[in-house]
């Protein structure tokens, strides 16, 4: 070994997961919700995207994003609006995880976190 030489630590590249399997993980997280919550999510588009937009990335690395008006903030004039949308970002989640088990759990927590925002729960109030 050369004097002063420090080997680079192995670079973590995340876990591998096909888009199809990742979408199944997201769908499974939604399907395991109690039925009463699933019914409330019927008009919410839950989508998988590879990466967040540049604007979202600049605001702080995101694993998911809720876009819409939380249920509790909708007034009587709430109509003629696009459906709410929850985006789950595949590549950041893959990079953040070391194992398939960890990926399943992080996908589940991210889905629950964004659904929490749909129900009007702030980041500070969410336990995850």
What are these regions (language model features)?
Residues 1-106, 118, 124-128:
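Active-site rim/adjacent substrate-binding subdomains
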């Amino acid at each position: 070994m050369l004097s002063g030489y420090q080997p680079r630590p192995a670079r973590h590249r995340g876990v591998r997961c096909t888009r199809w399997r990742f979408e199944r993980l997201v769908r499974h997280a939604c399907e395991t919700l109690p039925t009463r919550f699933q019914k409330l999510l019927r008009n919410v588009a839950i989508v998988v995207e590879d990466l967040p937009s540049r604007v979202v990335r600049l605001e702080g690395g995101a694993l998911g994003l809720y876009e819409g008006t939380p249920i509790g903030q909708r007034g009587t004039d709430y109509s003629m609006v696009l459906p709410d949308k929850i985006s789950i970002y595949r590549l950041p989640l893959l990079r953040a995880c070391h194992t398939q088990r960890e990926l399943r759990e992080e996908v589940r927590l991210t889905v629950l976190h964004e659904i929490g925002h749909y129900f009007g729960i702030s980041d500070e109030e969410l336990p995850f």
